[in-house]
């Protein structure tokens, strides 16, 4: 029975370019949609730009245009980039739409009627110059824990501490530079802590859908269990769903000057995009996919592809909103990890913060990236590392050396010797290939989004096809008298196997598959076309080169095109009463500020005595485990062995949170030796207790990007003291 599925991807924010990190999730979603359609399932695939919020309003103001003009322009840019990478949405909408306003107001009204909305007075920082309340990320100042300057209002990027904006020292508005003042405002809250919501979410996050599949991957379900707690516990906080004017968004009905927070109407944008698409087509019953009762009776599915950074919103707030407003809840959340490049966080200084547009402008084939991302995807929340040398090797070996090579070695003989017409296929070869396919379970791997396993099995089949060609040597048969019939069979069989490989690769490489369909003069391939030998007498077209090899110089040019200079300005200290820069977050400006600070402090730092130095207990530490910290942009959780043991004599590693995520992939750290401060007082952080500090080097003047953890010389052992 055909499945009926509504698939969405997370809505990109209309305040910046699409980059390769974004594309991980969109490519994963597009592959799954293409596979489902090839299997004969009915799939509607929609997305939209997320267009509301303070950053949109301020960026438009800076550019001297209206927010509407900004989001219209970015909408075109985003859709262009997705199209260039083969992400084939049926419709790409905007959250700033009539459909989204109607849905947001309706859902809010139903939640209000069900007792899930309440108002409270809260105290917030207010910018007296811009006459606006400031979101946490638009307040900056000195960290209350370590004293680092130029830190955001919710967490410190230097020491990793989390705090309230009111705890910042010397706070200032990142919008105007003015000193903010505290003001009280009435806000609207969605009561996520309501026992009805807690009970529902505890069941929903741990349960299965109608098809018997878990709604959440195991890692996501475990995270929900941590956030929800056990039965009888209530760890959830209510959710502030309102913002004060001025704000770019939808005004809350009956609340002048109050607007829906962007995260309320953003996921509702899935429904709005689908409604616009359905009404434009005229043959889709929207309620069959959105209404709780009708969705159940019609057996429709709602599948969201999202990044793990927005799991909290999609696995808690979103299903609870839908449930208690009478809408269907998601069938499944497909959560992907972050992208690293060559084992490190994307970096503008290294040129690895690569935009989708620059990749296309530099002339690189987008299907190289689609293939590589698919090869690294396994259906879990693990991060994907784009190892550029590995991508070159994998594309050149798998796609050019194995797959395309089959057609390039055989097509010419069909054209020259047999007037472009195929002969009979070798029944034994095709039967052996079919048997190998059935054991590979490629379709199951695609359905489970384990694309890496699917591609490994497809390349194993490509090896079998190449082995068939190598064993029968058509280039030698062509030179031998009386072997034309055998040559015809061998080349025709090879092209039938090539057709099947193309079919299996089509969800990942739709553009290349279209070229092959044209070359073999075939209609669009469907999954059940496999094992139907191309008939004798079938005419194919002239072979055209299908894919070029990746050259290292192309990758180097791409990195150079994306490299942002971090050269600092002249080393002059800012005036004591100078206002901070208006725009926050620039790497260039951050480097300049760090350089200014260094210029002042290098000669002014007081000397310390040897006694002061010996108070610091520096130890050699072995990194026995390293993990990403969910919800932290900068931190890695380390387990460090410094020779300590528990009462039973077993190793007792220390837990330390280190702000080195921008420079290191956790997997590359395990087993390394480094240096830590062992007698630093334990500090309770948002993510757990930190029992020390790892030492790392960085360039104080900002000329060289990066962080570098210290490593001892050969022979040092865990627990040794550094003197």
From Swiss-Prot:
Binding site for ATP: 348
Principal location: cytoplasm
Superkingdom, natural source: Bacteria
One GO process term, biological-process aspect: methionyl-tRNA aminoacylation
SUPFAM superfamilies: Anticodon-binding domain of a subclass of class I aminoacyl-tRNA synthetases (SSF47323), Methionyl-tRNA synthetase (MetRS), Zn-domain (SSF57770), Nucleic acid-binding proteins (SSF50249), Nucleotidylyl transferase (SSF52374)
Record's keyword annotation contains tRNA-binding: yes
Keywords on record: Aminoacyl-tRNA synthetase, ATP-binding, Cytoplasm, Ligase, Metal-binding, Nucleotide-binding, Protein biosynthesis, RNA-binding, tRNA-binding, Zinc
Chain location of the short sequence motif 'HIGH' region per the record: 12-22
Stretches the record annotates as Disordered: 568-604
CDD domains: Anticodon_Ia_Met (cd07957), MetRS_core (cd00814), tRNA_bind_EcMetRS_like (cd02800)
EC category: ligase
GO cellular component assignments: cytosol
Compartmental location: Cytoplasm
EC number, as in UniProt: 6.1.1.10
Residues at which Zn(2+) binds: 143, 146, 156, 159
Location of the motif 'KMSKS' region: 345-349
CC cofactor note: Binds 1 zinc ion per subunit.
InterPro entries linked to this entry: aa-tRNA-synth_I_CS (IPR001412), Anticodon_Met (IPR041872), Met-tRNA-synth_bsu_C (IPR004495), Met-tRNA_ligase_1 (IPR023458), Met-tRNA_synth (IPR014758), Methionyl/Leucyl_tRNA_Synth (IPR015413), MetRS_core (IPR033911), MetRS_Zn (IPR029038)
Needed cofactors: Zn(2+)
Catalysed reactions listed for this entry: tRNA(Met) + L-methionine + ATP = L-methionyl-tRNA(Met) + AMP + diphosphate
Family as reported in the entry's similarity comment: Belongs to the class-I aminoacyl-tRNA synthetase family. MetG type 1 subfamily.
Complex formation: Homodimer.
Protein name as it appears in the record: Methionine--tRNA ligase
Organism: Azoarcus sp. (strain BH72)
């Amino acid at each position: 029975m055909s499945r009926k599925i509504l698939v969405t991807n997370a809505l990109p924010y209309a305040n910046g370019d699409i980059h390769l990190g974004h594309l991980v999730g969109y490519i994963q979603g597009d592959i799954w949609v293409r596979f489902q359609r090839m299997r004969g399932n009915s799939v509607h695939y929609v997305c939209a730009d997320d267009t509301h919020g303070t950053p949109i309003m301020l960026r438009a103001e800076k550019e001297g245009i209206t927010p509407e003009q900004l989001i219209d322009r970015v909408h075109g840019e985003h859709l262009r980039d997705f199209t260039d990478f083969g992400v084939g949405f049926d419709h790409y909408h905007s959250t700033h739409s009539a459909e989204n306003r109607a849905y947001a107001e309706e859902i809010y009204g139903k939640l209000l009627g069900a007792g899930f909305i309440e108002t409270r007075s809260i105290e917030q920082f207010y910018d007296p110059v811009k006459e606006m309340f400031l979101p946490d990320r638009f307040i900056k100042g000195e960290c209350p824990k370590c004293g680092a300057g130029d830190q955001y209002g919710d967490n410190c990027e230097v020491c990793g501490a989390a705090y309230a904006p009111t705890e910042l020292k010397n706070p200032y508005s990142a919008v105007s530079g003015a000193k903010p003042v505290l003001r009280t405002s009435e806000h609207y809250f969605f009561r996520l802590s309501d026992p009805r919501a807690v009970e529902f979410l505890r069941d929903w996050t741990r349960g299965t859908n109608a098809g018997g599949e878990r709604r959440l991957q195991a890692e996501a379900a475990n995270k929900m269990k941590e956030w929800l707690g056990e039965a009888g516990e209530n760890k959830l906080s209510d959710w502030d769903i309102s913002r004060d004017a001025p704000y770019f968004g939808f005004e809350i009905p009956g609340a002048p000057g109050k607007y829906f927070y962007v995260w309320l109407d953003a996921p509702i944008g899935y429904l709005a995009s689908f409604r616009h698409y359905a009404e434009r087509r005229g043959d889709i019953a929207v309620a069959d996919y959105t209404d709780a009762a009708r969705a159940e009776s019609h057996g429709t599915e709602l599948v969201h592809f999202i990044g793990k950074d927005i799991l909290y919103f999609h696995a808690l707030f979103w299903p609870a909103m839908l449930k208690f407003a009478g809408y269907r809840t998601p069938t499944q959340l497909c959560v992907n990890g972050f992208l690293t490049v060559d084992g490190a966080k994307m970096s503008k200084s290294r040129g690895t913060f690569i935009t989708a547009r620059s990749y296309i402008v530099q002339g690189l084939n987008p299907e190289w990236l689609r293939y590589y991302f698919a090869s690294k995807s396994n259906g879990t929340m693990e991060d994907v590392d784009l190892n550029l040398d590995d991508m070159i090797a994998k594309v050149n070996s798998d796609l050019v050396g194995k797959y395309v090579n089959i057609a390039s070695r055989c097509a010419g003989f069909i054209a020259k010797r047999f007037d472009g017409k195929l002969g009979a296929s070798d029944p034994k070869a095709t039967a052996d290939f079919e048997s190998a396919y059935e054991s590979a379970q490629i379709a199951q791997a695609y359905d489970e989004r384990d694309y890496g396993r699917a591609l490994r099995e497809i390349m194993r089949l490509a090896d079998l096809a190449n082995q068939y060609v190598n064993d029968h040597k058509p280039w030698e048969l062509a030179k031998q008298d009386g072997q034309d019939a055998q040559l015809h069979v061998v080349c025709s069989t090879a092209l039938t196997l090539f057709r099947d490989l193309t079919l299996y690769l089509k969800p990942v490489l739709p553009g290349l598959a279209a070229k092959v369909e044209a070359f073999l003069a075939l209609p669009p391939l469907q999954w059940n076309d496999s094992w139907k030998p191309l008939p004798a007498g079938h005419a194919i077209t002239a072979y055209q080169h299908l894919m070029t090899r990746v050259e290292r110089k192309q990758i180097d040019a791409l990195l150079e095109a994306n490299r942002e200079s971090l050269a600092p300005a002249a080393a002059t200290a800012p005036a004591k009463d100078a206002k901070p820069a208006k725009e926050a977050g620039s790497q260039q400006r951050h480097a300049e500020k760090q350089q200014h600070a260094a210029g002042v402090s290098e000669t002014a730092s007081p000397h310390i005595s040897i006694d002061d130095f010996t108070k610091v207990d520096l130890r050699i530490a072995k990194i026995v485990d390293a993990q990403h910290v969910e919800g932290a942009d900068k931190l890695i959780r380390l387990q460090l062995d410094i020779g300590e043991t528990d009462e039973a004599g077993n190793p007792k590693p220390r837990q330390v949170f280190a702000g080195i995520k921008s420079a290191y992939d956790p997997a590359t750290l395990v087993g390394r030796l480094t240096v830590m401060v062992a007698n630093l007082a334990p500090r309770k952080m948002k993510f757990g207790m930190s029992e020390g500090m790892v030492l790392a080097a960085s360039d104080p003047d900002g000329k060289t990007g990066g962080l570098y953890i210290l490593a001892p010389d050969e022979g040092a052992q865990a627990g040794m003291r550094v003197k």
